[in-house]
A protein has these predicted regions:
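ATP-binding glycine-rich loop module of kinase domains
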Residues: 33-66
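Catalytic-loop of the protein kinase fold
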Residues: 143-160
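Short beta-strand micro-motifs within the conserved protein kinase catalytic domain, predominantly
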Residues: 84-96
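Juxta-kinase regulatory segment immediately upstream of eukaryotic protein kinase catalytic domains
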Residues: 1-23
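Conserved short submotifs of the Hanks-type protein kinase catalytic core
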Residues: 93-107
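Conserved C-terminal C-lobe helix
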Residues: 265-278
Length: 295
């Protein structure tokens, strides 16, 4: 096996002022034109992200990296994001990099593994699940109140902390109220959690046209993520051999699997909230603020 790619040296040197001299640098991911590393030091840890200069999507990922940094700044000023989350950003000889504080948590899919078992129906698990959903919606409510949609709500962008709280990451695709300025066109995110109205808009417009995601689309994606990670099945069934546009055409119909037919055990409050989130008409979905009291 080859040696793991190293992060931008100038970024590591600069971040040492935040973490202290690195004691560990570990590659977390290397896919879709970008890489991420965990940099641990005596004073803390950060996630350093950089575009992959030799990747097919290097140019787009460079723009996305700059866009995410811009989004983090705006969301922080709007009070929708903890000011400690963003650490630093800059350029390097291969493009751009961005560093955010490390969040100690595991992706939603792994965290909810105990709930996917019939044995998950126990008194201690219900408030834990409700707490994850509530803290997730509280974060989205702050974004939505500021006029933003995260636009990439999905299991891998939601971490569950040891205390049972949801933490939202990855703001590169977010859609804000000032998106009249030049930006990377939003064309949906993870197919399986794409809201029907986003799927419809993507199918109806050229590939270089920006589709402005609204908060209601986040709510559908929230419901889809909880449905998927609790039941083990995606809410919209389709053949995995279909290409992305064909899958989006199925999603655009607005039909989902009945949750009661696939849930591992009965949890009426959670079921009702997820079902409401997956309403095909955006106007029929609850807001994030309304959801915070439903879990």
């Amino acid at each position: 096996m080859g040696q793991a790619p190293a992060p931008p040296g100038d970024a590591v040197a600069l971040l040492a002022g935040h973490t202290g001299e690195p004691t560990e640098i570990r590659l977390l991911s290397d896919r879709r034109g970008s890489r991420a590393w965990k940099i641990q030091g005596p004073n803390g840890a950060v996630v350093l992200k950089a575009n992959r200069p030799d990747g097919d999507e290097a140019r787009d990922k460079t723009a996305e990296m700059a866009q995410e940094d811009d989004h983090l700044r705006h969301l922080t000023v709007a009070g929708a994001l903890d000011p400690d989350y963003r650490v630093s950003a800059g350029t390097w000889d291969g493009g751009r990099w961005l560093a955010v504080n490390w969040i100690d948590g595991e992706p939603l899919w792994q965290a909810l593994a105990p709930a996917r078992s019939p044995e998950g129906d126990r008194a201690s698990l219900r408030p834990w699940l409700a707490g994850i959903a509530r803290t997730w919606t509280e974060h989205l409510a702050r974004m939505h109140a500021a006029g933003w949609a995260h636009a990439d709500v999905q299991p891998t962008n939601t971490l569950v902390t040891p205390g049972g709280h949801a933490a939202v990451i990855d703001y590169a695709l977010a859609c804000g109220p000032d998106d009249g300025h030049r930006r990377v066109p939003y064309r949906g995110a993870l197919t399986h959690t794409t809201a029907p109205e986003i799927a419809t808009a993507v199918l109806a417009t050229p590939a270089d046209t920006h589709v402005q995601a609204q908060p209601a689309a986040d709510i559908w994606s929230l419901g889809a993520s909880l449905f998927w990670c609790w039941t083990g099945q995606r809410p919209v069934p389709y053949d995995d051999d279909l290409d992305r546009l064909e899958k989006l055409a199925v999603i655009a119909k607005g039909t989902t699997t009945m949750l009661r037919d696939v849930r591992p055990w009965s949890f009426p409050e959670l079921e009702d909230a997820i079902t409401a989130c997956l309403a095909p008409d955006p106007a029929d979905r609850p807001t994030a603020k309304e959801l915070t009291s439903a879990w």
